[in-house]
Regions:
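Glycine-rich, phosphate-binding/catalytic loops in enzymes
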Residues: 48-51, 89-90
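A short glycine-rich, Lys/Arg-flanked "PGG" loop and its adjoining helix->strand segment in the class I
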Residues: 50-66
Length: 128
Protein backbone atom coordinates (compact mmCIF):
# COMPACT_ATOMS: atom_id res chain seq x y z
CA UNK A 1 0.00 0.00 0.00
CA UNK A 2 2.73 2.48 -0.86
CA UNK A 3 1.15 3.80 -4.06
CA UNK A 4 -0.12 6.93 -2.26
CA UNK A 5 3.18 7.64 -0.50
CA UNK A 6 6.18 9.66 -1.59
CA UNK A 7 9.22 7.45 -2.10
CA UNK A 8 12.64 8.97 -2.79
CA UNK A 9 15.70 7.06 -3.92
CA UNK A 10 18.89 8.91 -2.97
CA UNK A 11 22.41 8.20 -4.21
CA UNK A 12 24.66 10.48 -2.18
CA UNK A 13 27.31 10.54 0.53
CA UNK A 14 25.14 9.06 3.26
CA UNK A 15 26.50 10.98 6.26
CA UNK A 16 26.41 14.33 4.43
CA UNK A 17 22.88 13.62 3.21
CA UNK A 18 21.60 12.64 6.66
CA UNK A 19 23.15 15.69 8.35
CA UNK A 20 21.71 17.95 5.63
CA UNK A 21 18.25 16.45 6.20
CA UNK A 22 18.65 17.00 9.95
CA UNK A 23 19.39 20.70 9.37
CA UNK A 24 16.34 20.96 7.11
CA UNK A 25 14.15 19.33 9.76
CA UNK A 26 13.03 16.54 7.43
CA UNK A 27 11.66 13.27 8.77
CA UNK A 28 11.23 9.89 7.10
CA UNK A 29 8.81 7.05 7.81
CA UNK A 30 11.27 4.47 6.53
CA UNK A 31 14.91 4.18 5.52
CA UNK A 32 16.55 1.55 3.31
CA UNK A 33 20.33 1.66 3.16
CA UNK A 34 22.96 -0.32 1.32
CA UNK A 35 26.22 1.16 2.61
CA UNK A 36 29.55 0.24 1.02
CA UNK A 37 32.06 -1.95 2.80
CA UNK A 38 34.86 0.50 2.14
CA UNK A 39 35.28 3.80 0.39
CA UNK A 40 37.15 7.07 0.10
CA UNK A 41 35.63 10.51 -0.23
CA UNK A 42 36.86 13.25 -2.58
CA UNK A 43 39.14 14.65 0.15
CA UNK A 44 40.55 11.28 1.18
CA UNK A 45 37.94 10.60 3.87
CA UNK A 46 37.94 6.93 4.77
CA UNK A 47 34.75 4.88 5.17
CA UNK A 48 34.87 1.41 6.76
CA UNK A 49 31.53 -0.22 7.43
CA UNK A 50 32.63 -1.94 10.62
CA UNK A 51 33.66 1.44 12.11
CA UNK A 52 31.00 3.72 10.64
CA UNK A 53 27.76 1.73 10.59
CA UNK A 54 26.72 2.32 14.21
CA UNK A 55 27.32 6.10 14.02
CA UNK A 56 25.43 6.17 10.70
CA UNK A 57 22.45 4.36 12.24
CA UNK A 58 22.48 6.79 15.18
CA UNK A 59 22.44 9.78 12.81
CA UNK A 60 19.64 8.22 10.75
CA UNK A 61 17.54 7.84 13.88
CA UNK A 62 17.43 11.64 14.10
CA UNK A 63 15.55 11.81 10.79
CA UNK A 64 13.15 8.93 11.48
CA UNK A 65 9.65 10.18 12.20
CA UNK A 66 7.88 9.38 15.45
CA UNK A 67 5.63 7.04 13.46
CA UNK A 68 8.46 5.40 11.48
CA UNK A 69 7.53 2.05 9.98
CA UNK A 70 10.85 0.43 9.05
CA UNK A 71 14.63 0.71 8.84
CA UNK A 72 16.48 -1.73 6.57
CA UNK A 73 20.23 -2.27 6.24
CA UNK A 74 21.78 -4.42 3.52
CA UNK A 75 25.47 -5.43 3.91
CA UNK A 76 27.86 -7.29 1.66
CA UNK A 77 30.92 -6.85 3.85
CA UNK A 78 32.90 -10.06 4.31
CA UNK A 79 33.20 -10.95 7.97
CA UNK A 80 30.40 -8.64 9.14
CA UNK A 81 28.00 -10.96 10.96
CA UNK A 82 24.26 -11.00 11.51
CA UNK A 83 24.83 -10.82 15.26
CA UNK A 84 26.93 -7.66 14.88
CA UNK A 85 24.24 -5.99 12.78
CA UNK A 86 21.54 -7.18 15.18
CA UNK A 87 23.47 -5.68 18.09
CA UNK A 88 23.88 -2.33 16.29
CA UNK A 89 20.15 -2.14 15.54
CA UNK A 90 19.22 -3.28 19.07
CA UNK A 91 21.44 -0.70 20.78
CA UNK A 92 20.17 2.13 18.65
CA UNK A 93 16.74 1.96 17.05
CA UNK A 94 15.12 -0.75 19.16
CA UNK A 95 16.43 0.79 22.39
CA UNK A 96 14.77 4.11 21.54
CA UNK A 97 11.69 3.07 19.56
CA UNK A 98 10.94 -0.51 20.60
CA UNK A 99 9.66 -2.62 17.74
CA UNK A 100 11.06 -5.80 16.26
CA UNK A 101 14.43 -6.64 14.69
CA UNK A 102 15.08 -9.40 12.19
CA UNK A 103 18.51 -10.17 10.75
CA UNK A 104 19.54 -12.86 8.32
CA UNK A 105 21.57 -13.86 5.32
CA UNK A 106 21.00 -12.76 1.74
CA UNK A 107 21.04 -15.97 -0.30
CA UNK A 108 21.14 -16.53 -4.05
CA UNK A 109 19.62 -19.76 -5.37
CA UNK A 110 21.83 -21.87 -7.63
CA UNK A 111 19.73 -22.85 -10.63
CA UNK A 112 21.81 -25.90 -11.59
CA UNK A 113 21.30 -27.66 -8.27
CA UNK A 114 19.32 -27.38 -5.07
CA UNK A 115 21.64 -25.07 -3.15
CA UNK A 116 22.12 -21.41 -2.27
CA UNK A 117 25.09 -19.06 -2.16
CA UNK A 118 25.43 -16.62 0.74
CA UNK A 119 26.04 -13.08 -0.52
CA UNK A 120 25.64 -10.81 2.48
CA UNK A 121 23.35 -10.03 5.38
CA UNK A 122 20.34 -7.85 6.10
CA UNK A 123 18.86 -6.25 9.17
CA UNK A 124 15.32 -4.96 9.44
CA UNK A 125 13.67 -3.00 12.22
CA UNK A 126 9.90 -2.69 12.12
CA UNK A 127 7.59 -0.75 14.38
CA UNK A 128 4.98 -3.32 15.35
Amino acid sequence: NLQDHTIRFIVDDCIKFVKREQRRGRKYDGIVMDPPSYGRGPNGELWKLEEELFPLIQECMKILSDDALFFIVNCYTTGFSCSTLNEALSRSIQKEKGGHIECGENLLPVTTNDSVLPCGIFGRWTND
